[in-house]
């Protein structure tokens, strides 16, 4: 069995995005993929076969004030507007949608690691 874990780390996980692009370029596959936070986004794009998708999110879209800004922080308490990232940009009709059909048909097991916010 081959497995991979991407522990995320917000925008620091651009490194992970590059690693998954390398895996796609070289046909590397895994039986299980574990993702935490931003690592889930990297793995979703990897399993959907969308090379360079997350790199563009980190380098192109992140420059938009809707994506990441002090205004977001003042309005919502979060520097990054995750509704914009995972809704507006990534949904089926978004600017750069995740290929859900390919993701769902990928035989790899995708395990998302999360904790309940109030109890841990």
What positions do the PLM features span?
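Short coil/turn connectors at secondary-structure junctions
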Residues: 1, 29, 106-109
């Amino acid at each position: 069995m081959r497995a991979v874990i991407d522990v995320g780390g917000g925008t620091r996980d651009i490194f992970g995005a590059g690693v998954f692009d390398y895996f796609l370029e070289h046909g590397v596959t895994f039986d299980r993929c574990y993702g935490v936070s931003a690592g889930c986004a990297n793995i979703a794009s990897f399993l959907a076969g969308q090379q360079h998708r997350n790199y563009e999110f980190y380098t192109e879209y992140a420059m938009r004030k809707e994506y990441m800004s002090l205004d977001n922080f003042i309005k919502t308490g979060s520097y990054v507007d995750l509704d914009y990232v995972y809704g507006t940009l990534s949904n089926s009709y978004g600017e750069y949608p995740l290929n859900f059909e390919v993701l769902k048909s990928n035989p790899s097991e995708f395990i998302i690691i999360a904790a309940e916010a109030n109890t841990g």
